[in-house]
Amino acid sequence: MESVAYILVLTMTLAVLFFAIAFREPPRIQK
């Protein structure tokens, strides 16, 4: 379970960084 928790925290960290950059910069992909 330790490895699962580590992967979960790492994924959440990457997601936070991704959303921070995505919302900081203007959206380039328009649908």
Curated annotation (Swiss-Prot):
GO terms for biological process: photosynthesis. GO terms for cellular component: photosystem II reaction center; plasma membrane-derived thylakoid membrane. SUPFAM superfamilies: Photosystem II reaction center protein T, PsbT. InterPro entries: PSII_PsbT (IPR001743), PSII_PsbT_sf (IPR037268). It is found in: Cellular thylakoid membrane. Its main location: membrane. The chain crosses the membrane at residues 3-23. Keywords: Membrane, Photosynthesis, Photosystem II, Thylakoid, Transmembrane, Transmembrane helix. Signal peptide: none annotated. It is a single-pass membrane protein. Belongs to the PsbT family. PSII is composed of 1 copy each of membrane proteins PsbA, PsbB, PsbC, PsbD, PsbE, PsbF, PsbH, PsbI, PsbJ, PsbK, PsbL, PsbM, PsbT, PsbX, PsbY, PsbZ, Psb30/Ycf12, peripheral proteins PsbO, CyanoQ (PsbQ), PsbU, PsbV and a large number of cofactors. It forms dimeric complexes. PANTHER family: PHOTOSYSTEM II REACTION CENTER PROTEIN T (PTHR36411:SF2), PTHR36411. Found at the monomer-monomer interface of the photosystem II (PS II) dimer, plays a role in assembly and dimerization of PSII. PSII is a light-driven water plastoquinone oxidoreductase, using light energy to abstract electrons from H(2)O, generating a proton gradient subsequently used for ATP formation. This is Photosystem II reaction center protein T. It comes from Rippkaea orientalis (strain PCC 8801 / RF-1). The gene is psbT.
